[in-house]
């Protein structure tokens, strides 16, 4: 399932197995709560973890398998993937999906302006960044880490810490996105001409550093800091 929540700026993909997902109409930390039609459990999108819903008993804590979605422009995507097929323009609804009712992302205005307030009160207020500044975040069983996308665009590489273990984020200018990797040996990387270079002279695409790539996704800062 491909899911999107405009209120938190999160586009996330989930392996659904034999079930299908619906939208409950409820929110937590402004983030959509999905439900699966198999167990009727509720699933906050950002957490990807089940919570009891009103139609079922406590299912216990389960987590969804996720796959990476890339938030980018259609132009950048088709430049890199010219054979991409659009599955359908027929959504089955009369509502037009050619216009975003909340504002625009390029340039960012309306609801998406970095300084704008969330639609509903956030779970946590963290003033290290503007509420709707876009970060790329990753979370594992050990902890969570997030990188400011504006800073990553400028620096190309950023180092961070995830529960005491080094991680590194790399910027991909072709898709205007970032990737996060474990860096257990705290290796030194440099960025040259759109590629990442390690200490031995090895050259890598920003999406393919020679270490474990972690699942990551874009989110508004207030949403990320509210959950993590």
Regions found by a protein language model. Give the residues of each.
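Mid-to-C-terminal functional-domain signal that highlights helix-capping/loop sites
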Residues: 1-228
